[in-house]
A protein has these predicted regions:
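Short alpha-helix
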Residues: 223-242, 248
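A short SAM/SAH-binding and catalytic strip from SAM-dependent methyltransferases
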Residues: 152-166
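A short glycine-rich, Lys/Arg-flanked "PGG" loop and its adjoining helix->strand segment in the class I
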Residues: 168-183
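A short acidic, Gly/Pro-enriched loop at the edge of an enzyme's catalytic core
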Residues: 141-154
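A C-terminal cap/extension of S-adenosyl-L-methionine-dependent methyltransferases
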Residues: 236, 246-301
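Conserved class I S-adenosyl-L-methionine
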Residues: 2-57, 68-75, 183-213, 259
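Class I SAM-dependent methyltransferase SAM/SAH-binding core
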Residues: 60, 66-143
Length: 301
């Protein structure tokens, strides 16, 4: 147990106060106009574009509340089923102008089956070449309500699997949903981010346990808990779910400060910075750099 200036306030040090707001940022704050997060989003978009199947495919999107990934896939001509965790989020999805006969969901709980037929984005949404978007209400942590081998690909962007504390179980469900040869792209919190957040919260006991821990969980001020991974652990978790790992790499390598300085000096460098970042991330495959890791895996067959 620690005491003195570095101790946790709950251990009795009256002079210690936790920070009012976290300084270690896990993702773009709502409404952020920070150029770094615009850069980050564009890097994620390029990485997704390079990963997507070339032929039109049926894709399950469990990337949380942000719909930018689903719309990008629709624009590329894919049939996308997007899982929404809360019923009220369905009303926030923009309606396709070509589908004006759609109606809001009925009051009460909407099942996955009925939600799947309620809101469909027809051909041409977001410039899609025959792509379509359907949104369903359900728990992305437990996907047993989909039929086996229903999808050609699964996207778990936006740190989605870091919020699934029993990640192994969720990945086993994803394996079941993928057709043989189907692929998975995921993004999770890195161990580097987890260590930084634990240090910021002065959780020294948890930090000292990390080398011996099988799973590293990090609490947030709002009560949520996320799981972070190092590359070897992520590979082991994917392999245990009978998925073949194509690669594991950092989402970003360049520091936020370096990106901001470069953009402040010359905004026209934005495309070059994005391409450089994507190439650097691929070169640093297997390394735990930056706040997030991305991984590509597939069901054998």
């Amino acid at each position: 147990m620690l005491s003195g200036p570095g101790a946790d306030s709950q251990l009795g040090d009256p002079d210690f106060r936790r920070p009012l707001a976290p300084t270690v940022v896990c993702e773009a704050p709502a409404g952020s106009d920070d150029p770094y997060w615009s850069f980050y989003d564009e890097v994620a978009s390029v990485q997704l574009r390079e990963w997507l199947p070339g032929a039109p495919s049926r894709v399950l999107d469990v990337s949380g509340q942000r719909d930018r990934f689903a719309r990008q896939m629709v624009a590329a001509g894919h049939q996308v089923i997007r899982v929404i965790g809360e019923l009220d989020q369905l009303g926030k999805i923009p309606m396709d102008p070509a589908n004006r006969e759609s109606h809001p969901p009925p009051a009460g709980r909407l099942t996955a089956a009925t939600a799947a037929t309620w809101r469909t984005a027809g051909p041409g949404i977001a410039g899609g070449r025959g792509g379509a978007l359907r949104s369903v209400v359900g728990d992305a942590r437990s996907l047993d309500w989909f039929a086996p081998t229903s999808f050609d690909a699964v996207l778990a962007e936006g740190r989605a699997l870091s919020f699934c504390l029993a990640t192994e179980s969720t990945l086993e469900e994803i394996h079941r949903l993928l057709r043989p040869g189907g692929q998975l792209l995921l993004c999770v919190d890195s161990l580097l981010l987890g260590l930084a957040r634990l240090a910021e919260q002065h959780r020294w006991a948890e930090l000292s346990d990390v080398p011996r821990a099988d799973v590293v969980l990090v609490p947030a001020e709002d009560g949520t808990i996320t799981r972070c991974f190092w590359p070897e652990e992520l590979k082991a978790v994917l392999t245990s779910a009978r998925l073949e790992v194509d690669w594991i790499r950092p989402r970003t390598v360049l520091s936020a400060e370096a990106v901001k300085r470069a953009l402040a000096a010359d905004m026209s460098s934005f495309p070059t910075l994005v391409r450089t970042e994507v190439e650097l991330a691929a070169e640093r495959e297997g390394e735990s750099i930056g706040i997030h890791l991305i991984a590509s895996a597939r069901r054998p067959g």
